[in-house]
């Protein structure tokens, strides 16, 4: 634990050895993430992390100290806005908090994007963190834009616990996608169809439940060919389309009433 803290501090201080190690890990991780998202047909215009904003933080810290917007308490820097619990900006050893780097991302976005609204799509359990962050945005006068936290629930197993693999490890997205494909391959051998349906299963399982609530990911249930599942919906769509084609009616001009 202490070793990890020291490494984190050295990264914040831009120590060359740690930066080089980090770059290697960063490049491998980013390529892997992009590859997985590409398989799922998800794309982003920008892939930015804490490292892209870290250099903006020292000047910000000096500014809030100078303006008496933050005070030192046993070496730690705390926002002087009266929040309870207090908003910790840096630890006593000078290392940054999640709040610190989140503020850095806001500084970066205000400089480069200047959006009217910033939406954070993050686990509902981070609600208090974002409430505190948004109060600091106003207190430090970082932006006049609107800030929203769109929280979502956790994906659980049949027992209501966070979804894990059989070995008790965190269920990685790629592993989940692979397991869905294996399940669907038992009823359809066409690789292209299986991949398409697997994406539908993942998407539908998220959309069919209340966004802020936790839900149970039941592999057999969500890959079922009947009932409330993505596969059944797509099957129904194909059947309906086939009936329309056989009717010889130009359905583009049909109207829906009632």
Q: Language-model segments: which ranges?
A:
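NTP-dependent nucleotidyl-transfer catalytic core
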Residues: 1-258
